[in-house]
């Protein structure tokens, strides 16, 4: 029985050799993913380690001529992807793999590329604050570079329509995922700059995995954003997603919706500004009128205390100039208010808040009418008061009394003679008539009965 099986008997050496040949010929090169453990590098420069998963492990070797091409230093516990040949180490009969190339597995590779590019661009100064352009305030036209079918575009347009319906939006559609996406994004940025239609750009997309967002970690995209003459707001993924584009952009928004909030103005805020401007205008008019009224009162009191006709004429001239200046100032203010209201109305014309605008315009017209009537009434009242004051002062003027035939006599020391006992025979007195003075001597004094 033994003799019939003699041809099938293997020596240990032959067995190991046969198994090695079978493994190398049948398996060829394969890709293997696993976790590194027991990593060593002796003086020869070769790498020896174990690849394992939850239930199994295999010994690996990577010779110096191969590991020289690996761009990272393998670490214990690191997940890697290895391209290798399956073989058997004949002297010990150990099954092992000979690695030809190695790279971090899955997102580990992408994360490593991300960190390398981030460090490179940071060293070149592309992230420096001194290169950041300020955003226009307000924006007159917004450019959006994203997928025309993505949720990000819908969110951006929804926010812009709600906040600032009249703000023009230009969409530069592009792929945001896949091999062609970086090139398309770069061309869209360059096109927007060449056309010069908008003064701010939103570049972004909705959320996703690191692989989904990878187009915004592309060096070409980063350099295109940096070179853009139009300020760029990056809006990639969710708040926790940070891409290279975020570092290079002039401003990073946590989401596409937030980017739309940043570049737009609130329509309700514009209406509040109009109402505030109306209130300030009314207060300014009231203050101006009150100030002029006080000034007029002061002038009136001074005129009462200083009767001479020439000064009255000068004050009347000054008052007329003040009235004219006040009229010009009020007309200028009303004109400015009308111009401001017209500008605001033009900006809001496309937003169609017509009921509020009509009410605001009616209110302004009422204020203008009331203001004009108030000014006219005040001026008429002040003219009447001024005329009455002049008439009163003329009525009590000593000159008017003299004109009616009366005289005023004074002693030599200037005292007005009111009683007979102030003089005696022989005293000299001066008498004021309407057209001059006369000097006389008292001959006798006769008291009245």
Curated annotation (Swiss-Prot):
Intrachain S-S bonds: none
Molecular function terms from GO: exodeoxyribonuclease VII activity; nucleic acid binding
Domain of life (superkingdom): Bacteria
Cleavable signal peptide: none
Catalytic activity: Exonucleolytic cleavage in either 5'- to 3'- or 3'- to 5'-direction to yield nucleoside 5'-phosphates
Keyword Cytoplasm: yes
Any one GO biological process: DNA catabolic process
Pfam families per UniProt: Exonuc_VII_L, tRNA_anti_2
Subcellular location(s) per record: Cytoplasm
EC class (word): hydrolase
CDD domains for this protein: ExoVII_LU_OBF
One GO cellular component, as annotated: cytoplasm
EC number, UniProt record: 3.1.11.6
Assembly mode: Heterooligomer composed of large and small subunits.
NCBIfam families: xseA
Task performed by this protein: Bidirectionally degrades single-stranded DNA into large acid-insoluble oligonucleotides, which are then degraded further into small acid-soluble oligonucleotides.
Family: Belongs to the XseA family.
UniProt xrefs under HAMAP family: Exonuc_7_L
Protein name: Exodeoxyribonuclease 7 large subunit
Organism annotation: Salmonella heidelberg (strain SL476)
């Amino acid at each position: 029985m033994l003799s019939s099986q003699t041809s099938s008997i293997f020596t240990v050496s032959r067995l190991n050799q046969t198994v090695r040949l079978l493994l190398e010929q049948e398996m060829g090169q394969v890709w293997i993913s696993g976790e590194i453990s027991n990593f060593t590098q002796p003086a020869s420069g070769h790498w020896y380690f174990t690849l394992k998963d939850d239930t199994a492990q295999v010994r690996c070797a990577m010779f110096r001529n191969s590991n020289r091409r690996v761009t990272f230093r393998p670490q214990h516990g690191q997940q890697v992807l290895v391209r290798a040949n399956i073989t058997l180490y004949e002297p010990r009969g150990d099954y092992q793999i000979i690695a030809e190339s190695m790279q971090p597995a899955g997102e580990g590779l992408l994360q490593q590329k991300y960190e390398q590019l981030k460090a490179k661009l940071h060293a070149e100064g592309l992230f420096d604050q001194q290169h950041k352009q300020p955003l226009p305030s307000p924006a007159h036209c917004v450019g959006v570079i994203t997928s025309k079918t993505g949720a990000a575009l819908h969110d951006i347009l929804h926010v812009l329509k709600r906040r600032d319906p009249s703000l023009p939006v230009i969409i530069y559609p592009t792929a945001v995922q896949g091999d062609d996406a970086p090139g398309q994004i770069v061309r869209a940025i360059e096109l927007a700059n060449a056309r010069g239609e908008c003064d701010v750009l939103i570049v972004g997309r909705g959320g996703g995995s690191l692989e989904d967002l990878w187009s915004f970690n592309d060096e070409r995209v980063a350099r295109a954003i940096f070179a853009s003459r139009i300020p760029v707001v990056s809006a990639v993924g969710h708040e926790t997603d940070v891409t290279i584009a975020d570092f290079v952009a002039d401003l990073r928004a946590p989401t596409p919706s937030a980017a739309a909030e940043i570049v737009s103005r609130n329509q309700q805020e514009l209406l509040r500004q109009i109402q505030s401007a109306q209130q300030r205008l009314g207060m300014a008019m009231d203050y101006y009128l009150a100030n002029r009224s006080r000034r007029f009162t002061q002038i009136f009191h001074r005129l009462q205390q200083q009767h001479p006709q020439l000064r009255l004429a000068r004050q009347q001239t000054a008052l007329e100039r003040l009235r004219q200046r006040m009229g010009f100032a009020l007309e200028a203010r009303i004109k400015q208010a009308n111009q401001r209201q017209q500008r605001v109305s033009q900006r809001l014309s496309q937003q169609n808040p017509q009921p509020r605008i009509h009410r605001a315009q009616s209110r302004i017209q009422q204020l203008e009418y009331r203001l004009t009537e108030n000014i006219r009434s005040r001026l008429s009242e002040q003219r009447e008061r001024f005329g009455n004051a002049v008439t009163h002062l003329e009525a009590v003027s000593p000159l008017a009394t003299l004109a009616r035939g009366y005289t005023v006599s004074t002693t030599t020391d200037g005292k007005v003679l009111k009683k007979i006992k102030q003089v005696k025979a022989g005293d000299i007195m001066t008498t004021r008539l309407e057209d001059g003075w006369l000097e006389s001597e008292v001959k006798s004094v006769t008291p009245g009965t």
